[in-house]
UniProtKB/Swiss-Prot annotation:
Residues annotated for Zn(2+) 2 binding in this entry: 101, 136, 350
Active-site residues, as the UniProt record annotates them: 70, 135 (proton acceptor)
Source species: Acinetobacter baumannii (strain AYE)
Keyword set, alphabetical order: Amino-acid biosynthesis, Cobalt, Diaminopimelate biosynthesis, Hydrolase, Lysine biosynthesis, Metal-binding, Zinc
Protein name listed in UniProt: Succinyl-diaminopimelate desuccinylase
Record note on cofactor: Binds 2 Zn(2+) or Co(2+) ions per subunit.
Oligomeric form and interacting partners: Homodimer.
Pathway(s) the chain acts in: Amino-acid biosynthesis; L-lysine biosynthesis via DAP pathway; LL-2,6-diaminopimelate from (S)-tetrahydrodipicolinate (succinylase route): step 3/3
Domain of life of the source: Bacteria
UniProt catalytic activity: N-succinyl-(2S,6S)-2,6-diaminopimelate + H2O = (2S,6S)-2,6-diaminopimelate + succinate
Length: 377
C-alpha cells in the first residue's frame, strides 16, 4: 500500500511513545522536515517539557500552527486490539494512541506547509509552529511559557490554528472559535467532631454545608450568549468522615468547577460563591485555581479562511462552536491572536483503541494548505 505523505509522517509520529510530558523525538522529526523548507528552528525546554518554536519569515502577519506531541496514558494494554504505539490500519481506520488527539493533525500541518512553501517560496508574512509536550498534563511548562517568551521579545501571532480534534460527525463539520473558561475550587468547611449519639456536643459540617451546596447547584450564573452556553457549576468530589458509622465528621471538603462564558468573570463567580457561603454562616476556607480564561474569535479573516477552505475541500458548511474542554488556545488568545481549532473527529480521543479515518488525513492537509493560501499567498 502506498502511503500518502501525511499518513507516512503520522505513522512515524505515532510510533513514538510520547506519554505526557515526554516528547520522545516527535518534535525533532517535525523540526527536521520544517528546517528543510526554510524554517528557523528554536527548541525551548522548560523543566521536563520540550517545546518547539519554528518560523519561516521575519515579517508579519504571522500564521501559526499550534499543537501538542504528548498523549494521555494508554490505559490497560490488554484492552487494546493492537499495540497503541505500533500504529495499525484496519478497515480504513488508523489505530494508535494520539491518532485523533492529535498526531495526524501535526503531520497534516507539516505536509501542508511543505506544499505551500514549494508553491509560494516568497509568501507574505511568516508561517510558524508552536508545539509542546505539555498539553495533556499540568500545562505549566508548555505553550504558556513559549507565549511568555515570545511576548517578552514582542513576537506576535496574528492567526493561530490549533489542530485539536474539533470535528464531530464528519471532517470539518465543527470548528472551535472559542472555549469556555475553567475555574476550580477546593472548599473546606469546618465543623466539630463528635459522637453521633450526642449531636448537641458536635457540629456536623455536612448538615451545615448542604443548604449552601444546594443553592450553589441551583443558582443561574448567567444565560450564556450566541456563542456560549450558560455557565455550568459542577461538584466533582465530596469527602468527610472517618469511615466510622458513629462519628460526626469534623470537616468537609468539596471540590467543584465552573465552566463559564464571556458573560461573567472569574472574580464575579468567586464573589457570588463567597456571598452564598457567608449567607449560610459557614466556617470555611476556599482555594481557587483559574485554569483558563474564556476566549472567542469572532467571524473575521481566520474564520472566513477556514470556512472557505473546508467548503472547497469537503463541501461541508462548517459550524462554529465553543463547546468542550479547555485547550492551549486559552494561552494564545490573550495575546490578541485570532485562534481557531480545527482537526479530525474527536469521537475516540483518550479512549482504548483510539483511531481516526485514514481517508480524512489528506483532506485535512488540503484544508490546512488552503487556509495558508487564503491568508498568505
Amino acid at each position: 500500500m502506498n502511503h500518502s505523505d501525511t499518513l507516512s509522517l503520522s505513522l512515524e509520529l505515532l510510533e513514538q511513545p510520547s506519554v505526557t510530558p515526554i516528547d520522545h523525538t516527535c518534535q525533532t522529526i517535525m523540526a527536521d522536515r520544517l528546517a528543510k523548507v526554510g524554517f528557523h528552528i528554536e527548541p525551548m525546554r522548560f523543566g521536563d517539557v520540550d517545546n518547539l518554536w519554528a518560523r519561516r519569515g521575519t515579517e508579519g502577519p504571522v500564521f501559526c500552527f499550534a499543537g501538542h506531541t504528548d498523549v494521555v496514558p494508554t490505559g490497560r494494554l490488554d484492552a487494546w486490539n493492537s499495540d497503541p504505539f505500533a500504529p495499525e490500519i484496519r478497515d480504513g481506520k488508523l489505530y494508535g494512541r494520539g491518532s485523533a488527539d492529535m498526531k495526524t493533525a501535526l503531520a497534516a500541518m507539516v505536509v501542508a506547509s511543505e506544499r505551500f512553501v514549494a508553491k509560494h517560496p516568497n509568501h507574505k508574512g511568516s508561517i510558524a509552529f508552536l508545539i509542546t509536550s505539555d498539553e495533556e498534563g499540568p500545562a505549566v511548562n508548555g505553550t504558556v511559557k513559549v507565549i511568555e517568551t515570545l511576548e517578552k521579545r514582542n513576537e506576535k501571532i496574528t492567526w493561530c490554528l490549533v489542530g485539536e480534534p474539533s470535528s464531530t460527525h464528519k471532517l470539518g463539520d465543527i470548528v472551535k472559535n472559542g472555549r469556555r473558561g475553567s475555574l476550580n475550587a477546593v472548599l473546606k468547611v469546618q465543623g466539630k467532631q463528635g459522637h453521633v449519639a450526642y449531636p448537641h456536643l458536635a457540629r456536623n459540617p455536612i448538615h451545615e454545608a448542604s443548604p449552601a451546596l444546594a443553592e450553589l447547584c441551583q443558582t443561574v450564573w448567567d444565560n450564556g450568549n450566541e456563542y456560549f452556553p450558560a455557565t455550568s457549576f459542577q461538584i466533582s468530589n465530596i469527602h468527610a468522615g472517618t469511615g466510622a458509622t458513629n462519628v460526626i465528621p469534623g470537616a468537609l471538603e468539596v471540590t467543584f468547577n465552573f465552566r463559564y462564558s464571556t458573560e461573567v468573570t472569574a472574580e464575579q463567580l468567586k464573589q457570588r460563591v463567597h456571598e452564598i457561603l457567608d449567607k449560610h454562616g459557614l466556617q470555611y476556607e476556599i482555594v481557587w485555581n483559574l485554569s483558563g480564561l474564556p476566549f472567542l474569535t469572532p467571524v473575521g479573516e481566520l474564520v472566513n479562511a477556514a470556512q472557505t477552505a473546508i467548503l472547497n475541500v469537503t463541501g461541508t458548511e462548517t459550524e462554529l462552536s465553543t463547546s468542550g474542554g479547555t485547550s492551549d488556545g486559552r494561552f494564545i488568545a490573550p495575546t490578541g491572536a485570532q485562534v481557531l481549532e480545527l482537526g479530525v473527529l474527536n469521537a475516540t480521543i483518550h479512549q482504548i483503541n483510539e483511531h481516526v479515518d485514514v481517508h480524512d488525513l489528506d483532506p485535512l492537509t488540503d484544508i490546512y494548505e488552503q487556509i495558508l493560501e487564503n491568508l498568505l499567498a
